[in-house]
Amino acid sequence: MEYRLSHRAQNLRRCMMDAFHLRDAKDMIFFNSGQPAADLYPRALLRAVLDELLAEEPQILAYPGSQGDEELREALAERQNRLDGGAGIRAEQIVVTNGGTGGADLLAQLFIDPGDTVLSETPTFPETLDCFAKAGARLAGVSMDADGPLPDELERLAQKCRPRFFYVIPNFQNPTGRCTSPERRRAVAEIARRHGFFIVEDDPYRELNFDAAPPPSYHSLAPDCTISMGSLSKTIAPGIRIGWLVLPEELVERAVMTLKATALCYPALLHRAAARVLEHPQFDAHIDELRRDLKRRCRLLTGLMSAQIPTGWLTWETPRGGMFLWCRLHGGVSAMDFAVRARDRWHVAFFPGVCFTPNYEGEDFSLRLTFARQTDAQMAEGVRRIAAALKSFQQN
């Protein structure tokens, strides 16, 4: 039988990252998992609040509404305002989604028609871009430096493409680990206002700073032209699939109508449990432990690499937070060739930089390592394998 797929289904891109996941490889060491180690999930807190809810609030298992649990939305607004003093977010502006990617998909349904242009930083997180591409968006990337997206390039593309919005990850960015400077944020906001597009601010890593907190958000600087995205995947657990959008109030009703037509309602038990975890006095201690562990892991990885890998072969940007190390190969070594050989011959997996580009072009000599999930022994063995793989390229 011949199946006639919709244009939207045909627009789906095969994610280049899929070739490097290889979860079944028995002795593979993974530097490609962007989630905390399982022992850092707040399991005791989750268990306690779930037991309490099931025992004392059985009505939580009934059909809920579509915007998201009210207690969760209030907890999210309170926490966002505490972390980012100028945000001024209210629970009524928040629409809870199925993880951060669910928020991106909702934005695509609300704003993108086939042929519209969406801008993003490049490199960036590709699975969000897949949501926009599925809706028929044309993708274009704005290059970055250590301070964030380049304003002159954004200005040029804004004039040329008339974008619907500009997608950014301002804090401890995936994949580069960079944090956009306050000056660069103000410049981006000014361009967005002048050209009449809005900024989609994806901020799942804000709380993962190693030392100093990140600068004020785009939302606090330019609430009139910013839609914020958030997620609990990095601070509680990815498996609970809780994300959210902060929308102008006049858009909330339309967003809820769209969600209702897609999934009717949300998993009320998990929403309420997440709210209770966020409100719990121990949650801040959990975040502090997560920060300390990620900082330690980052230092361990960079220390191992410094000891074993010559700077003529590989260099990297040391992040101030998050879970990603952005590296650059030298000597003309292709990141794709290196990643494939390292995976197949040395059984160590990571992503080449091209995976993080809007149209899978460029970043030929870049690669991303993560330091969030391995044991110390796995990290040490993984660096040994990376060094050996690099040496094999130098000898060719």
Protein language model regions, located:
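Hydrophobic residues in well-ordered beta-strands that form the structural core
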Residues: 120, 141, 199-201, 274, ...
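Conserved core of the PLP fold type I
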Residues: 59-196, 206-227, 294, 377, ...
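Conserved glycine-rich beta-strand-loop-beta hairpin in the small C-terminal domain of fold type I
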Residues: 291-302, 314-328
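Conserved C-terminal alpha-helix-loop-beta "cap" of PLP-dependent enzymes
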Residues: 252, 256, 327-368, 381
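N-terminal small-domain helix-loop-helix segment of the aminotransferase-like
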Residues: 8-99, 106, 279-280, 349, ...
